[in-house]
Amino acid sequence: MTMKKLLTLVAALAVTSLTAYQASAEQLQSHLYDITKSGMLKVCIWPQYYAISLRNPDTGKLEGIDIDLSEQLAKDLGVKLEYVETSFSTFIADLQASKCDLGMFGVGATMKRAQAVAFTQPYLISGVYAVVQKGGKIKSWADIDKPGVNVGMPLGSYIEPFMRGYLKNAKVVAVAPPATVQAELMSHRVDVMATDFPASTKMNAQFDWSMTLSPPEPMSVTPYAYVMNQGDQIWLNYVNLFVQNIKLDGRLKAAAEKNKLGPIVAP
């Protein structure tokens, strides 16, 4: 073997070794490695989200599609599950502070949020709806964007920036926890609750005075996905595979139908 060939072989081996080392280092830095090593999956949820991740006020237990599916994810991983409470206005900071490994609470995958966090493929899709009180001054979608009308939505939700751009005459009221838009609507501090399919379903099921208004055309149709810190491709690949599997094996459909979310399951 000539010296030139020997040097070429040594260089190739060095590159191969470096690539293997880098891959090993990336694996050790992944949440997937940390989760399997610790035996614990930490999932961020917003416990006020009906049919998604609600803490039932009567039982104190968590329920909803993402409670069911987070249990399935932990089962697939072979680890225990711990919930970390967050909100739409704080979940990005909570993820970046490593308070949880993953957000599973119907997070709208918007372009702006994607600048700060990573999203999986979607599992639900919803547009914007309006919930009002029967017999009130708001009787149709056309009545909403008028002077003197207060439109409420959760602070930090994807609906907030959309409605700020959409409404030209009505007032936007972004409601911060622990207050809820539902309570603001019931107390007449807002006239309209701008919300999504799960929350509108809850209101109609829970209150006989509740009425849902749909826009003339679908509005701000948004994919809902699971969310994590950027830069962890190994963990993102794993959770994407989980989402793909639950679509194929029927677990997503079953969990959605159980929680009355069948109409908004993502294809």
Residue ranges and their predicted role:
Residues 41-42, 78-80, 96-105, 148-150, ...:
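Alpha-to-beta junction loops
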Residues 39-45, 63, 142-156, 171:
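Short loop->beta-strand "edge-of-pocket" segments that line small-molecule binding or catalytic clefts
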Residues 124-132, 197, 201-244, 262-267:
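Periplasmic-binding protein-like
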Residues 26-106, 258:
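Extracytoplasmic small-molecule ligand-binding "clamshell" domains
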Residues 67, 71, 75, 80-145, ...:
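Acidic, polar ligand-binding/catalytic clefts
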Residues 26-30, 158-175, 211-215, 244-267:
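Ligand-binding clefts/hinges and TM-proximal coupling segments of bilobed small-molecule sensing domains
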Residues 53-59, 70-79, 159-176, 204-208, ...:
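Ligand-binding cleft/hinge of the Venus flytrap
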Residues 26, 67-76, 142, 157, ...:
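Extended ligand-binding regions for polar small-molecule ligands
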